[in-house]
A protein has these predicted regions:
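N-terminal secretory/targeting leader peptides
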Residues: 5-103, 112, 118-234
Length: 234
């Protein structure tokens, strides 16, 4: 018993940092707390997870770079954010490519996630979990969107991704990249007319305070992912 205890104590305890851009009350961030508790239990306390929401460790690109360099253990991002490394990931941002959550899950289980991880492996990255971030819809301070023409002329914040910008152009609006943490003040001061994201983001980031109109366009459903360094995990 004493030998086993000494061996257990000799194992170095690890703290895994998990970075996200969302607010601490976003459903995904809340679930990360549960993930950390489960991991700590399964490893008998050898691995603990510290969560850093609200872009405390940088934007998506910066946190992905930190994971690659070994300075951050886990980050959550949209699957499309990985187009910085694997250009094929841009397909996840195509409008209406997934008709429902069930359709998206069927595609992932049917081989899409394995294909994607094989591409990421070449960049020393691996997806450890696929997450449903909800479908993205448009919200703005100018007008309700009941038909395509209502999008004309709107300046909307989008993620730093060419597919998102092209999609907004196809809808008649203009997409402009902007960090998550800057959206509220940009809406408040009129720098942008609106943004597009899932309803939980509208709520957790309090964008509803400065964007009067929420339109259930559900134009994009892109899965979120938890990312680690493949070599570190192995």
């Amino acid at each position: 018993g004493d030998v086993y205890k000494r061996q257990e104590e000799s194992i170095e305890k690890m703290v895994w940092k998990l970075g996200d851009t969302q607010a601490e009350d976003h459903p995904e961030v809340v679930s990360f707390g549960q993930f950390g508790e489960k991991l700590e239990h399964l490893t008998n306390g050898q691995i603990q997870v510290e969560i850093y929401p609200n872009s405390a460790l940088g934007n998506h690109r910066e946190m992905l770079e930190s994971v690659q360099m070994g300075n951050l253990e886990i980050t959550k991002c949209m699957s499309t954010d990985l187009s910085f490394y694997v250009e094929e990931s841009a397909i996840f941002g195509l409008p209406y490519i997934f008709t429902s959550l069930e359709h998206m899950d069927a595609c992932l289980i049917g081989g899409l996630k394995d294909w994607f991880n094989n591409l990421l492996a070449e960049k020393d990255l691996v997806v450890i979990a696929w997450l449903d971030a909800g479908s993205r819809s448009v919200y703005n301070s100018k007008n309700a969107i009941n038909k395509m023409e209502d999008m004309n002329g709107l300046l909307l914040r989008v993620p730093e991704n060419d597919v998102f910008m092209s999609s907004m152009a196809a809808f008649g609006a203009t997409g402009t990249p902007m960090p998550m943490g800057d959206i509220y003040s940009a809406l408040q001061t009129g720098v942008i007319d609106g943004a597009e994201n899932a309803a939980p983001v509208l709520y957790s980031m309090k964008h509803y305070e400065v964007a009067k109109y929420f339109s259930l366009t559900e134009h994009i459903r892109t899965p979120d992912v938890l990312i680690m360094s493949k070599s570190y995990l192995e």
